[in-house]
């Protein structure tokens, strides 16, 4: 990439073979579009369909299921093989579909705004889509327009560009088209100092300019950052790690159990084919086949709920990660604040007050308002606004007193002007006022006040005394103490329109001051208080000045003392170790660069925190990637920031992050309920089969029974638990520890309930055989002593009790401490519906002959059904007794 800033205008035009007057021809532009490609940021290469499918099946659990399906098919159990294969295919389809939806959402975000560019081609100005701009195009710039590519400026008129998307600096930068010989050195000049360059995705806030396109698409400065992002890998979230660990563990357990059971069967001299099927039964029992799909579906439902809270989840695991966040690092502008400068105070005619108390009937204060509106190059109405944010704030203030710029300029026509420049820090305009002429001047108080010789007080022009100056400066200091940006205003009267522009800003008459600030969002303070209750720390990170940052932070309750702030220069001079030792006591970082943000996030994560980071600019992308949860702004955010983030806020509001955290906590809690339910049920199945084989009994459950229970009977309650109503106290709890296991404190519960379900199933198996044969021997269960019909009846009883007891057990998962009767059985209508559907389907399997043949089950008597129902409610009764005992 050439250092275009170090070349003269003529040399740049020669190198790019273009012409300032005529631009490129359409023919050459078309050729260059083919040569350089479209002027847009490339997305990460999409995975092929086969790559996506392989990613979904590349898992230990899935491999065990595939082997089980192959063995089932080999021994002629086609029903079992088909069901297992269906499970594998369904899981893969759900995963692939979910990934495709995420990609579609990304594409939609990219297309939300397709900016246009005005270029000169064949000597004519044409508006074209920005992606069609090519190197050598002559591009026109004016206020309010986004810059379509990297430009070497060749003509400017008071051009200001807001480069925060690239550099992080929110104050617009003055641009020129001048060749700077000092930039000829070998050292790379920082982007912020390349005054004769304008960069892709930055915004013109003032003036106009002409530039020649030098770099487009991925060759632009923003493209370079996008390239780095594509090379970065994403870390796994705690839930992903836990599920991956569970998957591997269960896979190995399934294989180990199969081997052990096969050896036991061999020692017991059992039939080889029977042991194959028993081993498959155990493998299937050990694996919660519906788990991946259930987790994905619950997360997807959570995503839909979050959309209603103005939160778009780009990556499903971010839902869970949000729930474990311990620190929210938030940008100030637009997220904690309203992102619009607002005039809040004024000083005029010896009066210092809030703007709402300004008196338009007071001649001095009215002239202050007129100056604010007339000495102004911005435009504003209810539908749109263009120009510098400070000037827009002045117009908004005027409009609240019914002073519209269009109307005032008709009465007081502008006849001359002296534009703002960064050296004078002032701007002046000349207007007609009845039979005379007024020059209106606004600017920084340190530049304007020394040029004032008089003051307008009580409707009269008086000499400006030292006492007056002291009073003015004290008013300015009062505004500064409240972190307000201070602007001063003056005027001068003329009898003729022949005004000497060189002396326009001399011997001025002081009118007044205004103080403005980007005020906090009204709802944010309550959200930060809620975060504190939830054990979440809010850290403000901003490029703004220390005093402004502290004023906002104090008002919002983020910081209480100035010692809780660190500025960028201090971060430069502190080691990572020192920062880590201090970071727990720092709540605000001011005047920071993108590199500082990454350093802060690293330090916070090194202390074991789960960090959420907000950002909107390209420069924020590295820190968004570095954080556990990157949150991009949907309104002001760049495509690169959105691409780097896990979450996008459609309203750019801090309160939406807090709502997302609450939703994330509830979703994680519900997913945990679903997983514990599935695993306790699977453990019950393993207990049933393991004990039966160990005792030398016939197999109490067939593979198809276990598959049915795992895929259908268990899946509906697991999904229903995944959408359990929100816990109103969830934001009163501290965040869970980053290393906390998914099963923390839950293993005894899981094992106990698994044993209960397993033993109840075995009791049903014993009773089924006894009821059918009438054998007085307690255990007529050895394969050689039980006939086929009796075994069928016993397996049917075991199958029904296993299914029903698991359905009832699902109600235990709603709360481990509160009784289901105090929560309310019907407060989760989906769970009640799942229970009814599960019972109905089970009855159909037993009662409808074709289904009974497929599942290998036997009709039950009224006595059988009564016994089954009695056994099935025991898990609920036992858990309610335990809860009551703990409570007392």
From Swiss-Prot:
**According to the lineage, what is the superkingdom?**
Bacteria
Query: What's this protein's name?
Result: Calcium-transporting ATPase 1
Q: Which reaction does it catalyse?
A: Ca(2+)(in) + ATP + H2O = Ca(2+)(out) + ADP + phosphate + H(+)
Record keywords:
ATP-binding, Calcium, Calcium transport, Cell membrane, Ion transport, Membrane, Metal-binding, Nucleotide-binding, Phosphoprotein, Translocase, Transmembrane, Transmembrane helix, Transport
Q: Which InterPro entries match?
A: ATPase_P-typ_cation-transptr_C, ATPase_P-typ_cation-transptr_N, ATPase_P-typ_cyto_dom_N, ATPase_P-typ_P_site, ATPase_P-typ_TM_dom_sf, ATPase_P-typ_transduc_dom_A_sf, HAD-like_sf, HAD_sf
Q: Which residues form the active site?
A: 331
Under which EC number(s) is this enzyme classified? Answer: 7.2.2.10
Member of which family?
Answer: Belongs to the cation transport ATPase (P-type) (TC 3.A.3) family. Type IIA subfamily.
Q: Which PANTHER family match?
A: CALCIUM-TRANSPORTING ATPASE
Kindly report, in one word, the top-level EC class recorded for this enzyme.
translocase
Q: What does the entry list under GO cellular component?
A: plasma membrane
Which cellular compartments is it found in?
Cell membrane
| Main location group | membrane
UniProt organism field: Bacillus cereus (strain ATCC 10987 / NRS 248)
Q: Which parts pass through the membrane?
A: 53-75, 79-97, 246-266, 283-303, 675-695, 703-723, 747-767, 791-811, 831-851, 865-885
What is known about what this protein does? Answer: Catalyzes the hydrolysis of ATP coupled with the transport of calcium.
Q: Which residues bind Ca(2+)?
A: 284-285, 287, 289, 710, 714
An MF annotation (GO) of this entry = P-type calcium transporter activity
Q: How is its activity regulated?
A: Inhibited by cyclopiazonic acid (CPA).
Q: State the membrane topology.
A: Multi-pass membrane protein
């Amino acid at each position: 990439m050439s250092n275009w800033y170090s070349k003269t205008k003529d040399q740049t035009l020669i190198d790019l073979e273009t012409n300032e007057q005529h631009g490129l021809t359409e023919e050459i532009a078309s050729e260059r579009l083919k040569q350089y490609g479209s002027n847009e940021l490339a997305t990460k290469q999409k995975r092929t369909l086969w790559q996506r499918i392989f990613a979904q099946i590349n898992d230990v659990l899935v491999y065990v299921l595939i082997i089980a399906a192959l063995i089932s098919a080999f021994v002629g159990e086609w029903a079992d093989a088909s069901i297992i294969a269906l499970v594998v295919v369904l899981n893969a389809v759900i995963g692939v579909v979910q990934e495709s939806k995420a990609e579609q959402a990304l594409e939609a975000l990219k297309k939300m705004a397709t900016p246009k560019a005005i270029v000169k081609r064949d000597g004519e100005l044409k508006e074209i889509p920005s992606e069609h701009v090519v190197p050598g195009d002559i591009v026109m710039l004016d206020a309010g327009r986004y810059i379509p590519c990297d430009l070497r400026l060749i003509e400017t008129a008071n051009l200001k560009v807001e480069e925060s998307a690239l550099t992080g600096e929110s104050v617009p930068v003055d641009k020129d088209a001048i060749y700077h010989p000092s930039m000829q050195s070998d050292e790379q000049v920082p982007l912020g100092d390349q005054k004769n360059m304008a960069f892709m995705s930055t915004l013109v806030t003032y003036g106009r300019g002409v530039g020649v396109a030098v770099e487009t698409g991925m060759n632009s400065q923003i493209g370079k950052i996008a390239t780095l992002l594509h090379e970065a890998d994403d870390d796994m979230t705690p839930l992903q790690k836990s599920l991956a660990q569970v998957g591997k563990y269960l896979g190995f357990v399934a294989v180990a159990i199969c081997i052990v059971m096969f050896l036991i069967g061999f020692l017991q001299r059992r039939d080889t084919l029977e042991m194959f099927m028993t081993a498959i039964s155990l493998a299937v029992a050990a694996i919660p086949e519906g788990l991946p799909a259930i987790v994905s579906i619950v997360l997807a439902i959570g995503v839909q709920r979050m959309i209603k809270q103005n939160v778009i989840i780009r990556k499903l695991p971010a839902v869970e990660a949000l729930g474990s966040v311990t620190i929210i690092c938030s940008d100030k502008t637009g997220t904690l604040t309203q992102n619009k400068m607002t005039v809040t105070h004024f000083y005029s005619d010896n009066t210092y007050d809030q703007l709402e108390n300004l008196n338009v009937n007071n001649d001095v204060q009215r002239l202050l308002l007129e100056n604010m509106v007339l000495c102004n190059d911005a435009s504003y109405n209810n539908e749109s606004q263009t120009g510098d944010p400070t000037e827009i704030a002045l117009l908004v203030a005027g409009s609240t007193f019914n002073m519209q710029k269009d109307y005032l300029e008709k009465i007081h026509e502008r006849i001359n002007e002296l534009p703002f420049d960064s050296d004078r820090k002032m701007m002046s305009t000349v207007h007609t006022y009845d039979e005379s002429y007024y020059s209106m001047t606004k600017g920084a108080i340190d530049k304007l006040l020394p040029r004032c010789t008089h003051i307008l007080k009580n409707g009269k022009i008086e000499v400006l005394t030292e006492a007056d100056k002291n009073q003015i400066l004290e008013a300015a200091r009062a505004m500064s103490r409240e972190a307000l940006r201070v602007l001063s205003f003056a005027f001068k009267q003329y009898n003729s329109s022949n005004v000497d522009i060189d002396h326009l800003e001399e011997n001025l008459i002081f009118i007044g001051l205004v103080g403005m600030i980007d005020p906090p969002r009204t709802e944010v303070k309550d959200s930060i208080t809620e975060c504190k209750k939830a054990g979440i720390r809010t850290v403000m990170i901003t490029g703004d000045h220390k005093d402004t940052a502290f004023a906002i932070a104090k008002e919002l309750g983020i910081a209480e003392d100035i010692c809780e702030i660190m500025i960028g220069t201090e971060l430069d001079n502190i080691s990572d170790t020192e920062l880590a030792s201090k970071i727990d006591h720092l709540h605000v970082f001011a005047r920071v660069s993108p590199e500082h943000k990454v350093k802060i996030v690293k330090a916070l994560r090194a202390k074991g925190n789960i960090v959420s980071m907000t950002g909107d600019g390209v420069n924020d992308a590295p820190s968004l990637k570095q954080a556990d949860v990157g949150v991009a702004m949907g309104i002001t955010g760049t495509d690169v920031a959105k691409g780097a983030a896990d979450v996008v806020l459609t309203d750019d509001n801090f309160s939406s992050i807090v709502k997302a955290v609450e939703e994330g906590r509830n979703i994680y809690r519900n997913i945990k309920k679903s997983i514990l339910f599935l695993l306790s049920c699977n453990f019950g199945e393993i207990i049933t089969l393991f004990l039966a084989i160990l005792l030398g009994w016939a197999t109490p459950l067939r593979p198809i029974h276990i598959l049915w229970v795992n895929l259908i009977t268990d899946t509906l309650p697991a999904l229903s638990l995944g959408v359990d109503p929100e816990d109103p106290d969830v934001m009163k709890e501290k965040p869970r520890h980053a290393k906390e296991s998914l099963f923390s404190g839950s293993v005894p519960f899981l094992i106990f309930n698994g044993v209960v379900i397993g033993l109840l199933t075995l009791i049903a198996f014993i009773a089924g055989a006894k009821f059918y044969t009438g054998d007085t021997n307690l255990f007529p269960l050895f394969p050689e002593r039980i006939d086929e019909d009796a075994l069928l009846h016993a397996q049917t009883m075991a199958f029904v009790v296993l299914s029903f007891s698991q359905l009832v057990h699902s109600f235990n998962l709603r709360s481990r401490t509160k009784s289901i009767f105090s929560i309310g059985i019907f407060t989760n209508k989906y769970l009640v519906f799942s229970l009814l559907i599960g019972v109905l389907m089970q009855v159909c399997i037993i009662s409808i002959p074709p289904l009974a043949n497929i599942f290998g089950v036997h009709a039950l008597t009224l006595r059988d059904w009564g016994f089954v129902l009695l056994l099935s409610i025991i898990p609920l009764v036992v858990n309610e007794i335990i809860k009551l005992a703990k409570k007392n």
